[in-house]
Design a protein with these regions (language model features):
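Conserved small-residue
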Residues: 2-100, 138-185
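Short strand-coil-strand connectors
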Residues: 7, 113-115
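Outer-membrane beta-barrel pore domains and translocons
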Residues: 16-20, 113, 124-126
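Short Gly/aromatic-enriched secondary-structure transition segments
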Residues: 30, 124-127, 132-139
Length: 185
């Protein structure tokens, strides 16, 4: 914090830096319901949608994001139908996309006082962290995003070095939520 009197003007400035590092060290191994059923879990889904979820698991962090992905072949390449026109979502295959928490936040606040009048302003920065845009996924599904237009003009979406119809590709990934990986920023 800095305070300075500049004649009739009083200036106050604050700079705040914060960082949060966390790690899930231990989770409850099992618990017993009132009806006697024992529940065991090694992870806990904290929320999500069709193709995106936040998961707590030992060794991970609060804010870890997992996204659904596309079906792959035995070599790990994205599976394309024999006709070359479709891809398919992978059933219950989730990959780590990143963490929603910022690496750090920074704020700088200034206030000027003069004859009973006060003027203040603040700059904030949230640096790092992964976000997921379900709006981007929906726009891709309906074919109204810039990248769907580009792929339509280029003859289709490029998958494994070959073009497949953009409509088929984006309706598969956008409708399934698999597009969340493409909509991460």
């Amino acid at each position: 914090k800095l305070n300075q009197n500049l004649g009739p003007v009083k200036w106050s400035s604050n700079l705040v830096y914060s960082r949060n590092r966390n790690k899930v060290v231990d989770m409850l191994d099992s618990y017993k319901l009132s009806n006697g059923t024992v529940i065991s879990q090694d992870s806990m889904v904290m929320g999500g949608t069709t193709g995106v979820k936040m998961v707590l698991r030992e060794g991970g962090q609060i804010g870890d994001i997992y996204v659904n992905t596309l079906k792959t072949d035995e070599h790990g390449a994205i599976w394309v139908s024999p006709t070359g026109s479709n891809v398919a979502p992978a059933k219950d295959t989730w990959i780590y996309a990143g963490n929603s928490n910022p690496s750090y936040t920074l704020s700088w606040r200034n206030e000027f006082n003069w004859k009973g009048l006060s003027l203040g302003f603040m700059f904030n920065a949230r640096v790092g962290g992964v976000g997921v845009s379900l709006t981007q996924a929906a726009m891709d599904y309906f074919g109204v995003s810039e990248r769907t237009a580009t792929d339509r003009l280029n003859g289709g979406a490029l998958v494994n070095g070959q073009r497949i119809p953009a409509e088929n590709y984006y309706q598969t990934i956008g409708g399934n939520g698999a597009d969340a990986i493409g909509a991460c920023y």
